[in-house]
Amino acid sequence: SAASDVYKRQCLYTAMGGIHLAINNSPDLSTLAARKTIAPAKRRTFLFTELAANIVFESILNIAAFLFIIAVLRIHMTAHLGLALLTILVSTTFSITFGMFLGCIGPRSEGGKTGLMFATVMPMCFLSGLMMGNMRVVVEKHAPIINRINPAALISDSFYTLNNYDSMNRYARDILTLLLMTAILFIVSTLVTRRKTYASL
């Protein structure tokens, strides 16, 4: 349904939280981050704590929106509530980490970073069929590899699989791919942030 597609797109737009996280930990962009460089606590501790707080906060919001859709709007989105909540948690974690990655490598201004996020997320959503229903089928026919690495397609396919398949193999592949991509983006973001910190000293 249109509501469920909007919800899946919203899971990716939580990347905004990751962009703010990156800015707040870049000494060349934020006075707060500059103060952190001389704080006794390790920079890694700040980053982990803020990332965890962002994930918890955004996950609560996304879960609340999900429960509103299924309980109030009465739109069926899954037959496996527990796994659906896991999907939301993994999707939110990926999105925030993705936003942090874009915040680390993107333009210097916050507006530029936000623009980069929209310029990246919207094509992902389009190719996954969240903007035009049959697009994912077209991509699957002509370039299936895109559906295997497109985060929007993986999130959408996770919910689709929970609704339509008894086997969890495809669902597990989607979730594990998202987790792997999250880990890679986090490592790269941490290294870039650390390099910027050293450069600012």
Which ranges hold each PLM region?
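Short, small-residue-biased leader/transition segments that mark boundaries at the very start
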Residues: 2-7
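Short alpha-helical transmembrane interface motifs in multi-pass membrane proteins
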Residues: 12-17, 49-50, 79-87
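Transmembrane helix boundary and interhelical loop/hinge segments in multi-pass membrane proteins
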Residues: 18-39, 43
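Hydrophobic transmembrane alpha-helices and immediately adjacent juxtamembrane helices
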Residues: 38-39, 44, 196-201
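Selective transmembrane-helix segments that form parts of the transport pathway or gating/packing helices
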Residues: 42-69, 84-85, 89, 93, ...
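Membrane-spanning alpha-helical segments of multipass transporters and channels
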Residues: 79-201
